[in-house]
């Protein structure tokens, strides 16, 4: 495949994803380093069918697709060289607010750790009421950060290691649904993607 970095270079060189696909046969003349394997990857009928299936899922489930060019795309993430070209989102939140706190921690949180997490999130809600909490949806500190944010009525977003056609772990589904009104679920992965270790 082309990957995030390769796709970003193509779009930077040509102008947009639409232009890259529209002018794919001309790419070797327009951009140094583009070879036939890239054109083959861009010309893959199976990839087009997969993209159509994904868009049907997006529309049916009222998801938001954020591309690197979208103003709503998380600006801090956009600065990373390997930022995903497309993000899929379900929920309601501004990713580009002034205060964003990413919280991660052990999956085997102690009672002290859980209480510290809850107290920290509560203090944030008092000091920075517009704060956005971002974490995974895993056991331990991840899920406790989201639950603390919900309890203190502050925005919280879970970054998922799989597509939006599933929730993993399933026991966190209620919390995930509760987050949709003031935060939501974000992923770079297509549907039918399982939460493999390399995705975390």
Question: Which residues does each PLM region occupy?
Answer:
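Short, positively charged patches
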Residues: 1-123
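Glycine-biased, small-residue-rich flexible motifs in mid-sequence functional cores and linkers
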Residues: 67-200
